[in-house]
Amino acid sequence: MQRLILASKSPRRRELMDLLNKPYEVIVSEADESIDSSNDLRKEIEHLAYKKAETVFKDNRDAVVVGADTIVVINNEVLGKPKDEDDARRMLRLLSNNVHKVITGVCILSEGKIDNFSCVTKVYFNEMSEEEIDEYVASFEPMDKAGSYAIQGFGAKYIRAIEGDYYTVMGLPIAEVYKRLKSF
């Protein structure tokens, strides 16, 4: 296989890429991460994953580049990373005792080949009291996560169930990535 590059600064994505048990490099993409939430969100997040991969691929044309991005959607509102602690609290109140979708877009890019896709997982949250929300925000875990929670961290205790791929919620549907990388 050619050089493999992960175009992401996310420590969670690095953890998941490690599960492939294949050597890879990390080169952080400088792509603009804005999306137009008035468009089809799966298409938007797939396009963002493409932009991330393509930005890194331009200078690494001998490699296979994996780009990804994740959004949380509830009641047609896209929840990105919180701006501050108050924004994290607002998001957690929305998620509390509710169901939301997590969409992770992925692009695998090499010379002459593009595989751009997304995976969706439904997440069911338990009710969170104001005290629990404050305690969770005080842990600082929510501050760099889309939707203000980490399914693999302290946020796990608030999740009642999921429908779909757990790793999609973490930020990279690794089984799907592994399957698709076989054709590169």
What is each residue range found by the language model?
Residues 22-23, 150:
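A generic short alpha-helical patch detector that favors 3-5-residue windows
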Residues 2-5, 39-184:
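Anionic-ligand binding patches
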